[in-house]
Design a protein with these regions (language model features):
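N-terminal hydrophobic targeting segments that direct proteins to the cell envelope
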Residues: 3-97
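C-terminal solvent-exposed extensions
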Residues: 46, 56, 82, 204, ...
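Extracytoplasmic/secreted envelope proteins and their assembly/folding machinery
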Residues: 47, 99-101, 132, 136, ...
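N-terminal post-signal-peptidase region of extra-cytosolic proteins
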Residues: 50-60, 82-103, 137-154, 158-159, ...
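Extracytoplasmic
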Residues: 66-69, 97-102, 111-119, 130-132, ...
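Flexible, polar/acidic helix-loop-strand segments at domain edges
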Residues: 69, 173-251, 264, 344
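Second-shell loop/turn segments in exported
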Residues: 90-93, 133-141, 156-161, 199, ...
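Amphipathic, coiled-coil-like alpha-helical scaffolding segments used for oligomerization/assembly
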Residues: 135-196
Length: 345
């Protein structure tokens, strides 16, 4: 069982803020030196993220797969008032937090497309040294290092980099661009927060956006529907930020990047120079070139007193093989039913 929970802040979900960070970097054609210095002063380095990991999946050495990149993105459910990311955050401590949401971001070798793959936090998996458990327990048990090891063992995909993101940044960006429009197809009621969402279009500020993407109760598929909401909101957020707001005010990109770097922590092998080069390589990536999906599952169930998500071994193997071989475009064509639609429950 995971360490006992202490007082905890209301859980905030993760949407792929890393994608925002990298794509916004790509939009900045000037001010690179200023940007690097600003990010370097704001961002926290996570020590020993990959230290001591053995029997890791091989890194492809030929074809487009050799140039592809896999980034594990985590958001944490904190148990204290201390910041969990950014330069002012303390180091990881056992039991302080679990990874509330987990994404594997695959950047194709040609950098013309990307995939954001959600791994449900309740996925029942093997955690090295701890037996079976929910995938989000790994962060509580052993921090970034054990989380990377757990995901690599589960997927047989080599993780190139890790980032942990604070959800205050999600709220701040939503407010910074003046809110985001979202369509709700059917009226739903969130009994946990006493919020009723009427069918139709809603213009959400940062606080409202958090309520929207955090809802689980009242949705047909619970946590899986919440993951779909997070992905759909991210797609809208990125599109509005990059294709509307920054066209009207290109200089705003530096302010947005400075804001986001305050809420991010990355592995200590990932230098600011490397991040800048990656950002430049993504300059032609459009929001329509990003696919969103959830790892295939086989429903939910109970293990003892734990509500868990059961993964689908057969379809999962096909997905992770496509990631390793940098064939996500072909995989998506054959698995349209697993892609997150623009409008979700």
């Amino acid at each position: 069982m995971p360490p006992a929970r202490g007082w905890r802040r209301a859980r905030k979900p993760l949407i792929g803020l890393l994608v925002c960070l990298l794509l916004l970097c790509a939009a900045a054609l000037t001010g690179v030196l200023w940007l690097q210095a600003k990010v370097e002063s704001n961002i926290q380095r996570l020590p020993d993220t990959f230290t001591g990991l053995t029997d890791r999946p091989d890194k492809p050495t030929s074809g487009s797969a050799a140039d592809a990149m896999n980034i594990l993105v985590l958001g944490t459910d904190t148990r204290s008032d201390a910041p969990t990311t950014g330069a002012e955050a303390p180091g990881w401590e056992p039991g302080q937090a679990r990874s509330d949401t987990m994404l594997l971001v695959h950047l194709d070798g040609d950098r013309d497309s990307a995939s954001v793959i959600s791994i449900p936090r309740d996925s029942w998996v093997d955690i090295p040294g701890h037996g079976k458990g929910k995938v989000n327990w790994a962060y509580s048990f052993g921090g970034p290092n054990l989380t990377v090891e757990t995901v690599e063992k589960m997927t047989d995909v080599r993780i190139d980099h890790l980032t942990v993101i604070d959800w205050d940044g999600f709220k701040a960006l939503t407010d910074a661009i003046g809110g985001v429009d979202i369509d709700i197809p059917k009226t739903v009621y969130d009994s946990a927060r006493d919020v009723r969402w009427e069918a139709g279009r809603h213009h959400l500020n940062g606080e409202e956006a958090l309520l929207y993407v955090r809802q689980r109760y009242g949705l047909q598929d619970g946590d899986l529907d919440r993951v779909a909401r997070q992905q759909a909101f991210l797609r809208t957020l990125l599109k509005q930020t990059l294709e509307q707001e920054l066209r009207k005010n290109p200089d705003q990109v530096l302010d947005l990047l400075s804001l986001f770097s305050k809420h991010a922590s990355v592995d200590d092998d990932w230098s600011t120079t490397q991040m800048a080069k990656l950002a430049a390589s993504l300059r032609n990536l459009r929001t329509d070139d990003i696919s969103y999906l959830t790892v295939p599952t086989d429903g939910t169930g109970m293990v003892g007193d734990q509500s868990v998500v059961r993964l689908d071994p057969s379809r999962d193997r096909d997905l992770w093989r496509a990631v390793r071989e940098d064939r996500m475009g072909d995989w998506a064509e054959d698995n349209q039913d697993l892609l997150t639609p623009d409008v979700v429950r």
